[in-house]
Amino acid sequence: MRSEKRNFRSRLLAVGVALSVLLVACGDDSEPSGGDTGGGGTAEPATLRVALDWFPNPDHVALYYAQDNGFFDDQNLTVEFVTPSDVTAGLKLVATNRFDLSIFYQGDMFFAAQEDLPVIAVGSLVPQPLNSLMALHDSKVQGPDTVKGATIGVAGLPFDDAILDTIRKSQGLAEDDVESVNVGFDLVPALLSGQVDAAIGTYFNIEGIHIESETGEEPVIVKMEELGVPTYDELIVVANSEKLESDDAYADAVSRFLVAMVEATKAAQGDEAGSIENMKANTEYTDEEIEAMVPDTLPLLTSLQGLETGCFSLEAWQTFGEWMTSNNLLDEEVDPATIATNDYLPGC
């Protein structure tokens, strides 16, 4: 039962531009390099292997900005980003020490707690939701108040049903008032072909831009907070909780990684042109798409709750967990302090 709940978002890009990116899978099962570390510029060198949630894309702009502009070098870190052959396995790859860190999804941390995986979120990469209800500009669906009688494309993830139920409740609709169709990873093609009236699971800063480039019109985008879904951190940095406790060198390297990520995030936000050029070199999107996606993404790296860059609000995690429980995604409530911490990022 847990296996079907594990993946909060398997990154629903079935468009050709994403699939053209070469999958980097060599060495998935090798041990992380580790290494003794100290702190900052005088620290012993360390290497960290980081499993990405999906192919490199503008959601990772801060990571690649750090990589290409010396922020990891300043922390005496060598960082390798890898798209694993199974992008849904990020937490298990860290739990089994096959990767040092993973970029993954907040919702999955609650599932990991119920599976007793030794993982913990240590920093926020994208501190606000990117998921959305999306429709073409001329769709019958123009917002949550127009979903009655509509066909909504979903990927078959448990969160899809929870989001749909939240929409139905907010509009006083019965289950059969809105039809959902499982289109797997083909959300964008399903929208473009007219197979569905709208879709859940599309990132407005990525798929929204791609749809606009295909149709010449801005799609209808309804963000999660407008649908009644509590705010959450879309992408987080995940470490091995047991290793953090037992290996001081690993814990120090993780902290230095987070410091570099935060510094690079702030620098990237102040260098839109440089960030655009940086992502052009690291993704397979068209230059035109990157020139639109990156400016849309950079502001999303700022917390909606006024938190310092990279930091978590455990209160917000608690609220999101309660929403998951109320939508039958969890068997019991999970204490957010057991799955997320600010202890490894100075300034939180």
Where do the model's predicted regions map?
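Secondary-structure end/capping motifs
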Residues: 247-327
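Pocket-lining segment of extracytoplasmic ligand-binding domains
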Residues: 107-108, 186-189, 195-283
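C-terminal motif of bacterial Sec signal peptides marking the signal peptidase cleavage site
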Residues: 22-25
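Bacterial N-terminal signal peptides that target proteins for export
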Residues: 2-13
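Bacterial signal peptide processing site
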Residues: 27-30
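Conserved C-terminal helix/tail region of periplasmic/extracytoplasmic solute-binding proteins
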Residues: 317-348
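Short, glycine-/small- and polar/acidic-enriched structural segments
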Residues: 36, 40-184, 188-193, 197-205, ...
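Hydrophobic helical h-region of N-terminal Sec-dependent signal peptides
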Residues: 13, 17-19
